[in-house]
């Protein structure tokens, strides 16, 4: 008998576990989501540039642009998070993503709204505004870590899916420490780019099965 029952499987586990049909998804949609992820990452970098121009150079209009662009990026990121949740559930039979995904969206929206309603001067001095903002950042980081852990528990995923989850985990931990929340933007931006690659890989898989 030539077959060795203890040998490693010779098939691609991701491909082997793929569902035969994903009626709510198409290569075109997944490619579009991938490009939107890249746009979201570019938008986040643009927000940082406008914040610098407004807070450090003193251009008031740049601060206004940063606030509204930040809101647009947050809304786009929320949509993409929900689409990633749906894709992970359909493609990899992921479970337990609902609560952490919605809490990440809620924490992000509350943080963005507070940044738009409270002045920079209020956030820069000790007071309830600073305390509330720091509390939001800790909570935002905590639920981001929770989401990342749930993503890491998903089985038979693309390698870039794992990279995305680890970057999200690192960013969430750094955000929750408050002291490292500015540096946390780097791994979080990386996770957005990795999310784009997840969608692009999904599009290639679906196109190959067609």
Language model region names:
Residues 21-207:
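Hydrophobic, aromatic-enriched alpha-helical segments typical of multi-pass transmembrane helices
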Residues 1-28, 204-210:
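Low-complexity, intrinsically disordered extramembrane tails and loops of integral membrane proteins
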């Amino acid at each position: 008998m030539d077959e060795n029952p203890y040998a490693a499987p010779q098939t691609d586990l991701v491909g082997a576990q793929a569902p035969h049909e994903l009626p709510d998804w198409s290569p075109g949609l997944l490619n579009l989501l991938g490009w939107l992820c890249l746009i979201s990452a570019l938008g986040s970098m643009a927000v940082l540039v406008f914040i610098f121009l407004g807070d450090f150079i003193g251009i008031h209009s740049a601060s206004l642009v940063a606030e509204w662009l930040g809101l647009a990026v947050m809304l786009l990121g929320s949509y993409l998070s929900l689409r990633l949740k749906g894709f992970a559930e359909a493609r990899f039979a992921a479970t337990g993503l609902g609560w952490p995904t919605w809490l990440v969206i809620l924490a992000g929206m509350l943080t963005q709204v507070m940044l738009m309603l409270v002045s920079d001067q209020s956030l820069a001095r000790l007071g309830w505004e600073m305390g509330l903002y720091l509390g939001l950042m800790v909570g935002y980081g905590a639920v981001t870590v929770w989401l990342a852990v749930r993503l890491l528990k998903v089985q038979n995923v693309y390698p870039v899916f794992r990279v995305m989850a680890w970057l999200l985990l690192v960013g969430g931990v750094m955000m929750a420490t408050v002291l490292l929340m500015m540096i946390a933007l780097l791994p979080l931006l990386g996770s957005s780019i990795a999310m784009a690659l997840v969608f692009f890989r999904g599009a290639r898989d679906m196109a190959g099965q067609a």
